[in-house]
Amino acid sequence: MEKKYLKKINTAGLSIGLIVVTATLFSSCKKTAQPTDPQLSNAAKSNVHTENTVAPGNADAAFSGYNSAFLVNSGGTAYYKQSISSSTADGTWVASLDILAAEDDYERTGDPATKTLINNLLTTWLQNTPPPWTWDGWNDDIGWFSLALIRGYQMTGNNNFLTEAEYGFNMAFSRGWDTQYNGGGIWEQQPNMTPAGQAINKAALSNNSLGKVACLLYQSTLNTTYLNDATQIYNWIWAHLYNSSTGLVYADIDENNNVDMGSAVYNQGSFIDYANYLYEITGNVNYYNDAKRSIDYVKNNMTTNGIISNDASYLNTWGDEFARGLGHFVRDNRMWSTYYSWMMQNANSIWANRRTDYNITWNGWNEPTPSDNTLATSKFASAVAWLQFTPGAQPDNIAGEHVIVSAQNGIAVDNGSSTTNGNGVIQWGENGGLSQKWIFTQNEDSSWNIISEDSWLALDVPDGNAANGTQLDQWTPTRATNQRWWVDLQSDGTYKIWNQATSGCLDNSSNSTNGYKLIEWGWNGGANQRWELQ
């Protein structure tokens, strides 16, 4: 099996040729270290909220072009072709990379049509690649399979995707985690399935991809076994494949503890995303520091004149995982002022070098995309991903992690430390706990999703009930209108937070009792309806 995506290169040499807009083994011990009229139509609301909108830039055109060039979608069957000139569906791990780009678009937009597309893409993929997957000895393949599926579950709610993502992770982790060599780690390719003469090692690709899957499985199930697995894998990577001084993620380590210190942008990106997930799940700032250090390594060492680019013919994707890792880190931690200009520099180079007939750009972001209809579909996924995470204008500070505090009494919105669907949302004295941390992400219509970092459930109006006094609850994220919120800056610097479906505002009933219910109520402009985002 030829693994072009996984071909190992010494990027001490490659980095010299990188162009366009990112050893020592360590101890196994982890370091410590204006009010608006609630009767406005949805269209009018969209116009009111433009100051908070994450502008799409060229993201819509890029995804539309990607689909025009490669997507086959008919009668519920959907797949990406191997190339423009091909009629054959992309398969296995490469198809997973294609689908991840579509999931990036849905993450940005919340578009119901893209949600349906993702459901059809993954359903078709499972029909073409049914489990069991024990025939595939490459554990990172299973990582990409499972990553596309678990993201798809979080977006569509299709339980079959969760079932198969769990199967994929558990199968690869149970067979791949080995303590005989290197004190742990997941084999890149199972030794007993590796042809004679091929390398046997434990790679960043297999460990980062499966570690990310474990994080998303934990978010989806709250099964602490997955969090323990994610932490175990991460600690091993940190000790064996991560340079904590520079932020470089090494390629792999073999049975004799020989480390391939070659670098790849996708390895950096997977690690960054992984670290950021663990930071959000645990609150441990060391994960944040690791992620930022690895972003800065790419920015300072793996670009030419600021641009990330690689036109190597053997590659499938190059910058897609970095786009996700950087995009999530910057959005969730409100780091736009630090990285936005660099993100836009790359976005502009991507767009300037696109094929204008399809609006698609290959991995070489600093040079014109060839008009070659035989180039693999996955070569164009990284540009699509980057544009989904780079808004057309620098966002304000609403997006990201916040504690939501009442301007009236200083008490915080709290999920009651509950992981149960339908549990009522309450107020509690600010304490810095995960039950009081909420991630704000935006939809294309400029509304906001508000997700608990404790339960990974969404702030929700039960059944879209518009009655004044209805207690708000938490529910599995669906991005339905009863989970979409307008977040409007007021003249005093506070925010009005009101529901798209009901127009009811987040309200504390002018009560300062710990544990008291938070409700919705029609806007009256009182201090009980004004909130600070910390």
Question: PLM features: what roles do these ranges have?
Answer:
Residues V48-A101, D105-D140, K202, S263, ...:
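CBM-like carbohydrate-recognition segments
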Residues E2-Y5, T22-V54:
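Bacterial Sec-dependent N-terminal signal peptides
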Residues A214, Y218, Y226-A275:
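Active-site cradle of extracellular carbohydrate-active enzymes
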Residues Y106, Y153-G157, Y218-L222, Y279, ...:
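Short coil/turn linking the two alpha-helices of tandem helical-hairpin repeats
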Residues D396-Q534:
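Lectin-like carbohydrate-binding module/patch detector with strong preference for beta-trefoil
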Residues K115-S220, T224-T231:
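Extended ligand-binding groove/face enriched in aromatic
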Residues G269-T282, D290-N301:
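Oxyanion-binding "anion nests"
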Residues E2-I16:
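Bacterial N-terminal signal peptides that target proteins for export
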